[in-house]
Every structure is written in C-alpha cells, then in structure tokens.
Amino acid sequence: MSNQNDDTRVDLLGSDDFEKYLLYGSREIRQILQGLIDHHALITAQTVPGHQSFLTTVVALPDDGASIIIDAGPDEHINQRVGNAERLVCMSQLDKIRIQFDLSAPALTRYENRPAFRAPVPAQLLRLQRREFYRLQTPVTHTVTCRIPLPQPDGRTLELETRVIDISGGGIAVVVPPDNVPFGADMEFENCKLTLPELGTIPVRLKVRNLFRLTNRNGVEMLRAGCEFVDLPRSADNAIQRYIFKVERDRSARERGRL
C-alpha cells in the first residue's frame, strides 16, 4: 500500500444510470474481485470520513466466502486512519472498465506475515462500462482536442478547448476545469469541434454521461467527463475509426520494434 497524495486520485462524482451497472450477486462480485487479484490491479482507496487516499490491492478472498483482504502498508499512521474509518471507497479498472465498491469497517489484521485489512465482501459493486465500444487512450505526444461551446448568462458563447483522453466510436472522455464550468450528467452540447491529428476537425454533438474528479500529483483538480456522441454522422464515425486504427497500428509497430 502506498500513500496516494503524490499520485492521481479519482473520485466518482455522478453517472446517468448507476442501477444499470450495479451488481448485487455475491458470485458475480467475488468473480470481479478475484479478477482484481489475478491482474494485480491497483486500487485507489479513500477513507470515509477523513478522505485519506492510498493505493492498495486485493490480496485474498478467504474461504469463508464473506470477507475480503486488502494490502496495508508500513506507515502506521495511515494504517490507523484506515482502521478507524467507517468505510473505504475503492476504485480500480479491470479490462478497461471502471470498478467501484465500498468496504465497511476495515479491520487491521495480518496476511502472510504482512499487515493487511479485512472487511466484509461488498454487497454491491459498480461495474461502470461507460460505452460499449472499444476505448482508445489517446497518445500524449499527439493531443486530441475538442472545443465545446458553453452558453453564458449574458447570451454569449464561450468556446472551451478540452483535452480528449480516450475515444471510441461511441464517445469521448475529456478533461475540464472543476469550477465555473457547467458540466453535469445528461447535459448536451451542440456544435462541438473534435480535432484528430492528421484527419482534421469534425463537428460532433455530445451528451455528458458521467463525471469523475481527478487530482494529479501536483494537487491540481480537474474533472473527467465521459461524453456520448449524439446522432454521429457516418462520415465522422468513419474518421474516428480511421484514427483509432492508425494509432493502434503505430503502437503495434513500436511494440514489434522493441522485441
């Protein structure tokens, strides 16, 4: 386990229809938790109350079928705060799908001679597959942007330039400032301008589906907005698919070059 103060923290803010993504069956939940173990997936956990963020992993699902064990760390101060928490909000990714669940009353224990926390298996788990299309993380070296027109109270329109951090045939995720920007679930923005490297700018209409709060290692907070394309023209869809294919082809070529 490591302190998350110097890493990126992700807090789920809102989604359009959580019920669609909530799992309640203990077998399904345990399968996903086992997947986190098998993939050695890092988990961002946050204490409630207290908002102490740290990185951890699921290390075991005991045979009792009712408990989960997560990794603790060498910092006794953090471990004490975690052990005194009412619950932990845990967030991770598995197969590029965001996973979130709560652990109630984590209790300090030991597992394989290491400090750990034991808690009841969560009664529900959020498996947030925001879009049913393959999502591509955009290269940092070739920025994809989207200019979003924001109506102002005085009747003017402010065009906000956002950085696209992932893209698919179904939508995009963009980073927006956390304050003074009217972004909320189900809001729609027309006449947005999506700019793809080497392919130019295409007009799109976006609908906000969910929001996450991001905190980078420098303490700067931003919002990650997952947006769905609305009535995407075929020509725009073709351009997006060409872009995704090109980026994947280039990545594969680089990987082959390292072998």
UniProtKB/Swiss-Prot annotation:
One of its GO terms (biological process) is regulation of bacterial-type flagellum-dependent cell motility by regulation of motor speed. GO terms for cellular component: bacterial-type flagellum basal body. Gene3D superfamilies: Electron Transport, Fmn-binding Protein, Chain A (2.30.110.10), predicted glycosyltransferase like domains (2.40.10.220). Keywords: Bacterial flagellum, c-di-GMP, Nucleotide-binding. InterPro entries: PilZ_domain (IPR009875), Split_barrel_FMN-bd (IPR012349), T3SS_YcgR (IPR023787), T3SS_YcgR_PilZN (IPR009926). It holds the Pfam family PilZN. GO terms for molecular function: cyclic-di-GMP binding. Residues 129-246 form the PilZ domain. It is found in: Bacterial flagellum basal body. Monomer. Interacts with the flagellar basal bodies. Acts as a flagellar brake, regulating swimming and swarming in a bis-(3'-5') cyclic diguanylic acid (c-di-GMP)-dependent manner. Binds 1 c-di-GMP dimer per subunit. Increasing levels of c-di-GMP lead to decreased motility. Belongs to the YcgR family. This is Flagellar brake protein YcgR. It comes from Azoarcus sp. (strain BH72).
